Amino acid sequence: MKRDYDSVYQQLAALLEGETDPVVRMAEIAAVLHETFGFWWTGFYRVAPRPEGGTELLLGPFQGPVACIHIPYARGVCGTAWARHKTIVVPDVEQFPGHIACSAESRSEIVVPVFNEIGAVTAVLDIDSRELAAFSDDDVPGLEKIVSLL
């Protein structure tokens, strides 16, 4: 299914004009993507310090059912996208080694890293579907452009 990410990008760019708070920006992006495309779960995990040292992905703004709160570096699809610094498309989450099952209803997933001005990952956009193979490489450029709004 071809999704019109260009229109969503334009809508979000106008909506977020002048807004500097990253949590607000993440919340609006998650809401617009979720409502526009009817994804099952749409949200962000932020790179955050762990109390015992190091960093992890910590749940940020999202739309959908309750979610995992903490994701370790290089674990699951989100942690792997963070570690590899690249978008990961997973047609069938059951086939992804080390998949973290926050819900048995998630069947496919795409995770897009968010980079700061020096190229470090600061967050990931995680989108889940109840359908197998709901995402493809066709989704990558549009979603990467949208997260550049952060």
Task: Label each region the model flagged.
Residues 108-116:
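A short, aliphatic-rich beta-strand micro-motif
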Residues 128-146:
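Regulatory loop-to-helix N-cap segments in sensory/regulatory domains
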Residues 1-66, 144-150:
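Intrinsically disordered, low-complexity terminal regulatory regions
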Residues 47-50, 56-104:
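Regulatory sensory and allosteric helical modules in signal-transduction proteins
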Residues 115-129:
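Sensory-domain boundary capping and coupling elements
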Residues 74, 124, 140:
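ATP/adenylate-binding site constellation spanning eukaryotic-like Ser/Thr protein kinases
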Residues 41, 111, 124:
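Short hydrophobic/aromatic beta-strand element in the GNAT-like acyltransferase core
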